[in-house]
């Protein structure tokens, strides 16, 4: 199953009012589809808006689902007064990890570099995503300030040098993780790795059990410290794609460092359906507004 596919069907196309938008902006100064983003501003009459970055779920298989992600989750964020930046990233078929987190960080740097051009208030940049997008959003949050990281004999460039805006910060200020896979060493029955045909195998380019150091580098929990932004984690207890225990593991690790704002388990929530609902969308928007020091709606 492709992470995020079902939720795309469930919350297919929302109705939007008058909004300002720019689409298919390349944030890496190249020609790759996976390096494009769309910017949407609410119809609020302000000169600039605080920002939430949005990342689609696809089991890391897709490089062009930014519009789907916006259709699925954009409206509550716009209604909450945020500019929404929905981004593509390279797929696991295009490039192996850490290319995907390099892309996310490049997009955030681009946002800061071009804030005036697109009426963005970068005093606050939140980030959210569902499924594999939840994983990348979480990883962006826990790797604020991390350039290169080594586990065992494996060293990876987490920040990367994608694009022309490398002098700008890739920091994010708050994270909402929607049912993201977190610990790939415990994806199978909450206890062990999945096999060579799993999405994470495609992402890292090998059988997970044979690349435990890479799985540790892939895991947002590896990097958690007291300086990380606050997190809201949302997961349905009937999710058969990404086990609910993944978010329990993450919740416990975030709590230990004081970085968890709230953990929401949605009863009977699946991988999108039921988990995506008016109440959880409101929780997301209120969380971001609180972290951005905006009045609650």
Label the predicted regions.
Residues 227, 232-235, 239:
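Short beta-strand/loop motif that positions the catalytic acidic residue
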